[in-house]
Amino acid sequence: RFGESFWGFLPRTVLGSLRSAWHLEKTRLNRQGRSPWTLRNDVLNAWAMSVVLFAALGLAFGPGILAYLFLQAVFGFCLLEVVNYIEHYGLLRQRTASGRYERCAPRHSWNSDNVTSNVLLYHLQRHSDHHANPTRRYQALRHFEGIPEMPTGYAGMIVLAYFPPLWRRIMDRRVLAHYGDDIALVNIHPAKRSAVLTRHGAAA
């Protein structure tokens, strides 16, 4: 969301993902006539496996390793979510005349064709093609002209995202340029919407 820092996005997406995962599993199990409180629940199953893994490593290497396991887990999901943040910042699928959102297309996510990062990250930065064609193998992901383009590879973008003033200075103008300076087309953070529209001379 335009105007939302990564540090504001992080708790929202982590908690939202937990709620969404639980709701989806509860709905799936209810259709089968089952309670969500079962190991057939993939959410509980994953949590249980994590507890078993941490306990086994704690027994093998001593309780001191638990702090390292906790830190790597936090680092892991923070890395996942900062990538999520940089891949979609400010972009919005518009509603069609039918009231439905338009089909997902390469223009709905940020792309990078940085050679070094693409080699190291298995073309992760060609996210636009994956976004529009999720079944395409990573080796065949393509770069498109005229789609939102990151100014650098993922390593540089992740560092920028950790410093919101730098991020906004570089990325806000790129979001606006992608939409032809039409702020009404941008995915704006609701808490900042009025201030953003006023700053850009648009009606709230």
What are these regions (language model features)?
Residues 62-71:
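Hydrophobic alpha-helical transmembrane segments
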Residues 37-61:
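A conserved active-site cap/scaffold subdomain adjacent to cofactor or substrate pockets
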Residues 1-43, 64, 75-204:
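Cytosolic/stromal cytosol-facing helical appendages immediately following the last transmembrane segment
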